Amino acid sequence: MLKRSSWLAALLGLLTVVSTSTHTYAIELDEATRTVPLESSGRTVILTPEQVKRGKRLFNNSCAICHNGGITKTNPNIGLDPESLGLATPQRDTIEGLVDYMKDPTSYDGAESIAELHPSIKSAEIFPKMRNLTDEDLFTIAGHILLQPKIVSEKWGGGKIYY
């Protein structure tokens, strides 16, 4: 009985130490890092830490199968890096531009709809991962895409040489 109670006391002591330690292993992002372009007029928005986490989770669940690391598996010439997003027509280097694209995607030159080829809200019946995404979800996914170049720099959208 004494052995059992000493093991129990040791286990409780260990649990107490583990539960009171406050280690944070996630990267802490300051406001400057979490600031991303909202619209083409130059307005910006500061993402909350919760939006950052949610955007990453939603991107990984809905987009990363084709865009892991900011690449585009079906067209390696066009990635999610800031340069590619900024050169698209219409530009997609803002939250507003990316949300519009996720709702109704167009070709890189903006000439034609590609909703039947690219997952979007418009084609949610074909791409079920898009079905339940709200405008807030799209906002946080766009925030994640625009935040990544600040965190992983040229690796985001850099392609095979980095991944």
Curated annotation (Swiss-Prot):
Where in or outside the cell it occurs: the entry states: Plastid, Chloroplast thylakoid membrane
Top-rank taxon, per record? Eukaryota
Instruction: Give the residues the record marks as binding heme c.
Output: 63, 66-67, 118
Q: Which GO terms describe its molecular function?
A: electron transfer activity; heme binding; iron ion binding
- Could you list this entry's UniProt keywords, alphabetically sorted: Chloroplast, Electron transport, Heme, Iron, Membrane, Metal-binding, Photosynthesis, Photosystem II, Plastid, Signal, Thylakoid, Transport
Signal peptide coordinates: 1-26
What's noted on cofactor binding?
Binds 1 heme c group covalently per subunit.
What is one GO biological process annotated to this record? photosynthesis, light reaction
**Co-factor(s):** heme c
Where the protein is mainly located, per its record? plastid
Sorted alphabetically, the Gene Ontology cellular component annotations on this record are: chloroplast thylakoid membrane; photosystem II
Q: How does it sit in the membrane?
A: Peripheral membrane protein
> Which SUPFAM superfamilies does the UniProt entry name for this protein?
Cytochrome c
HAMAP family xref list: PSII_Cyt550 (MF_01378)
| Complex and partners | PSII is composed of 1 copy each of membrane proteins PsbA, PsbB, PsbC, PsbD, PsbE, PsbF, PsbH, PsbI, PsbJ, PsbK, PsbL, PsbM, PsbT, PsbY, PsbZ, Psb30/Ycf12, at least 3 peripheral proteins of the oxygen-evolving complex and a large number of cofactors. It forms dimeric complexes. The extrinsic subunits in red algae are PsbO (OEC33), PsbQ', cytochrome c-550 and PsbU.
Q: Which family does it belong to?
A: Belongs to the cytochrome c family. PsbV subfamily.
Function according to Swiss-Prot or TrEMBL: One of the extrinsic, lumenal subunits of photosystem II (PSII). PSII is a light-driven water plastoquinone oxidoreductase, using light energy to abstract electrons from H(2)O, generating a proton gradient subsequently used for ATP formation. The extrinsic proteins stabilize the structure of photosystem II oxygen-evolving complex (OEC), the ion environment of oxygen evolution and protect the OEC against heat-induced inactivation.
**Full protein name:** Photosystem II extrinsic protein V
Source organism of this protein record: Pyropia yezoensis (Susabi-nori)
